[in-house]
Amino acid sequence: MQHISVKAFAKINLGLLITGKRQDGYHTLETVFSPINWYDELTFSAADGLGMSCSTIDLPADDSNLCLKAAKALREYAGIDKGVAITLTKRIPFGAGLGGGSSDAATTLRVLNALWELDVPQGDLHGIATGLGADVPYFLETKGLAYATGIGEILEDLEASLPFHIVTVFPGEHISTVWAYRNFYPRFVRQAPDLKQMMKDLCLRSDFSVLPALENDFEPAVFDHYPAVRKVKEQLLEKGGFYASLSGSGSAVFGLFEELRDAENAARFFREHFPVALTEPFFTMQ
């Protein structure tokens, strides 16, 4: 092996309902993940030990990095001492609710499982992924839309993809997941919508009547504390989006567009101020 370069894509959340809190302190949720065309690039090179470098000094390249955590977890599971040098070119904003770190970890697991010829059973790989982060199994196991419950690790592949243009904007605020869970406004007692059926109605029939129920429970608190993030959502709708929402715990916000022209105009507008990604219809992770 000289080196192998792969893309690690980001995700957005279509609806995010916080449904309860477990005894171990983790919150349970219900959401639908969708991939977007915003990615980090990871390069894996032969090495005697484990090492890592990162394109930005804002992220650690030490044992706290999820890529190295993933490599070490895989080595420990397999009882091996193989090495690899990982180079991370970071493009997905962190603290954005886009799952960049989780995607990097999942990519590391998938690539090293193949490079080290481990053939780890899917169930065991899922367990390793969940130990690294609740979003990691999504990036490891699916390519398009997926319905998630538990803490985000229980997945059902919806075998579909969004038939719309997606404009995703990072307003520059780094919001920690810990902060978001401490500050969201609980709404545990309610009649939860059927997210799976709503996604089918939206993707297969363009049934926009389901959109008001696609809520993100982090939005009210995030918007109260970060009014600039609220403004981005409002502007996405003003620019022609038929739906806009916070992704995850933020601060990234995305809008769905029927017309390419409107999506391109919106992306052009926001690029004057913030990092932006434009994703084509029916996008899947490859």
UniProtKB/Swiss-Prot annotation:
Main function: Catalyzes the phosphorylation of the position 2 hydroxy group of 4-diphosphocytidyl-2C-methyl-D-erythritol.
Pathway note: Isoprenoid biosynthesis; isopentenyl diphosphate biosynthesis via DXP pathway; isopentenyl diphosphate from 1-deoxy-D-xylulose 5-phosphate: step 3/6
Keyword Kinase in record: yes
Family per similarity comment: Belongs to the GHMP kinase family. IspE subfamily.
Gene Ontology MF, one: ATP binding
Enzyme class (EC, first level): transferase
Reaction(s) the record says it catalyses: 4-CDP-2-C-methyl-D-erythritol + ATP = 4-CDP-2-C-methyl-D-erythritol 2-phosphate + ADP + H(+)
E.C. code: 2.7.1.148
UniProt KW Nucleotide-binding keyword: yes
Positions bound to ATP: 93-103
Alphabetical GO biological process terms: isopentenyl diphosphate biosynthetic process, methylerythritol 4-phosphate pathway; terpenoid biosynthetic process
Domain of life: Bacteria
Keywords, comma-separated and alphabetical: ATP-binding, Isoprene biosynthesis, Kinase, Nucleotide-binding, Transferase
Name listed for the protein in its UniProt record: 4-diphosphocytidyl-2-C-methyl-D-erythritol kinase
Pfam families: GHMP_kinases_C (PF08544), GHMP_kinases_N (PF00288)
Record field: transmembrane: none
Active site feature: 11, 135
Annotated source species: Chlorobium phaeobacteroides (strain BS1)
